[in-house]
């Protein structure tokens, strides 16, 4: 974990990664998010915790769920929200991300929610930020997507309870290119998940030690046996080299989640997907829209999680 994430007293200063985040901090964020969700604060009314605080969503990559979710979260805490669009900004004239941040900081912005295509870009911006400015990583390259990891854990707690010690979780698909998978793996380990299984083509599994301690395999049907939760991952075609997957049809045949396959998992196994979903590739319509799908619950939990993070960092 980057040392700049916590201050000298161990308090969260930025949220850049879930790797190495203390278990107590992780649980505090999840507990607070659960309180917000259960109190329906995220759906009705408006709080004034961040009144007078300016928050900017600084996105250098496209996003629907994450950006909208952060905007709503900040707005519902009473913040003034700015939405930065790289396509219409001075970055098209050559301005660096660092200069963009420093200029917005000079205008009084104190919270930055940053998405960037490059690994480590958000950490570099955090290093350049002034005292009292907080950065939240909304996804950088393949590295991390900490709030997605948090909302996935909140969704698992909601579906399966807070004790993860006997939980069997299967992460399926393009793990190699997935920042979500990395954040989920760090969180599951910190929370003491009983068994983490990782399944996908060899060409889409990382070889950097990330899967240490996991049960790894290519036989999806075998990996499903007795699973309590399935985390289906999107094929990150925008980050892939050609030829890693022979065809989408073959991928679906080997790794697509169908109702027949889901029946192999544990009774009432929860199905998660970070979105956007490639229907008919990693998951069928029947499963995505079925009774065991937690996809929309994940989206709803995202607002509560991001409110909890913003409140913790800026409140």
From Swiss-Prot:
UniProt similarity note: Belongs to the aspartate/ornithine carbamoyltransferase superfamily. ATCase family.
Keyword Transferase: yes
PANTHER family the record matches: ASPARTATE CARBAMOYLTRANSFERASE, ORNITHINE CARBAMOYLTRANSFERASE, MITOCHONDRIAL
GO molecular function: amino acid binding; aspartate carbamoyltransferase activity
Function of the molecule: Catalyzes the condensation of carbamoyl phosphate and aspartate to form carbamoyl aspartate and inorganic phosphate, the committed step in the de novo pyrimidine nucleotide biosynthesis pathway.
Descriptive protein name: Aspartate carbamoyltransferase catalytic subunit
Sites where the protein binds carbamoyl phosphate: 65-66, 115, 145, 148, 275-276
Organism: Xanthomonas axonopodis pv. citri (strain 306)
Gene transcribed to yield this protein: pyrB
Annotated residues for binding of L-aspartate: 93, 179, 234
Disulfide bonding pattern of the chain: none
PROSITE patterns reported in the protein's UniProt record: CARBAMOYLTRANSFERASE (PS00097)
NCBIfam families: asp_carb_tr, PRK00856.1
GO CC annotation, single: cytosol
Catalytic reactions of this protein: carbamoyl phosphate + L-aspartate = N-carbamoyl-L-aspartate + phosphate + H(+)
Record note on quaternary structure: Heterododecamer (2C3:3R2) of six catalytic PyrB chains organized as two trimers (C3), and six regulatory PyrI chains organized as three dimers (R2).
Gene3D superfamilies hit by this protein: Aspartate/ornithine carbamoyltransferase (3.40.50.1370)
